[in-house]
Amino acid sequence: MSSARQPRIAVRAIVMHESRLLLVNAWKGRTHLWCAPGGGVVAHASLPDNLIREVHEETGLKVTVGVPCLVNEFHDPTGDFHQVDIYFRCQIAHAKLDLDWRDPEGIVTHRRWVSRAEMAQLRVKPDSLAAVAWADADAPGYDPLEPIVA
């Protein structure tokens, strides 16, 4: 039996507004890697309830959680980190990002709405995020093990 840690489970939101996707910085204090908002799940709360909490913490927005649209795994090939992200399509009541909003955990410091063309110029994970967000016909439902990037 391996002594590696168990995979971490996280939830993420695909939030679209006027053909733009909501992204947040993926690493504390750095903005060179972008991802969909979300985070680790806590026990005894449903995946949608975890996602509602995480999106609000990171963006100040309130979402209604829809159907799952992607399961993505990533890991550190040289370590024992392995995370399974479950992405859900979400709806919002309003798209205005409050400039004074602060993530209570201090991880997310930048949030933005991006078009597909703008997203193509950014470093984004997972690699399949654009295809899933814009519902391409060939978008995967499962994106297997990607190496983590820093």
Set out the residue ranges of the language-model regions.
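Short connector loops at helix/strand junctions that flank enzyme active sites
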Residues: 8, 16, 36, 63, ...
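Active-site-adjacent beta-strand/loop module that shapes the phosphate/pyrophosphate-binding cleft
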Residues: 74-98, 112, 133-135
